[in-house]
Amino acid sequence: MKFVKEIAPYLIIIVLVVLIRTFIITPVRVDGLSMYPTLKNGEILLLKKYDRSFDRFDIVVVKYGNTKIVKRIIGLPGDNLKFVNNKLYINGKEIEEPFLSASVITNDFDINKFNIDKIPDGYYFVMGDNRTNSTDSRIIGVVPSKNILGITDFSLFPFNTFGKVK
């Protein structure tokens, strides 16, 4: 009985940590340069699993095969999306991408490449900020919301990047 009383607090802590990491928040590591310069290779971010209301330009973690990739939501369900002359057009209107550096080049692209006029309900178009070095929706197609693990907008490590991701 004494043993149970001694170990019970530790078991409760372990269960709470497992529940929090499974359903609420968990750390995730950036692997590669596809989000550079916004995020660096090896950076550790906090993934909010509970937040399922995705907005344009949110940084999200996507399950792609057996890996997790960090990308930015560019297109929402119902959007017609294309890039022409390094400019993003959504539903025919030019949209600014303030998070991109002036040197970033985005090759021409049209969502019609996938034989769709607009992004279907429950799907999103994601891209890396480092457009010439990113495996994203231009290659893998639109991403179902069930494959988006959550939003990540807070950097934990390295410590010089600690804080809200812009």
Would you name each region that the model predicts?
Residues 3-4, 11, 19, 23, ...:
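Soluble "head" domains of membrane/secretory-pathway proteins
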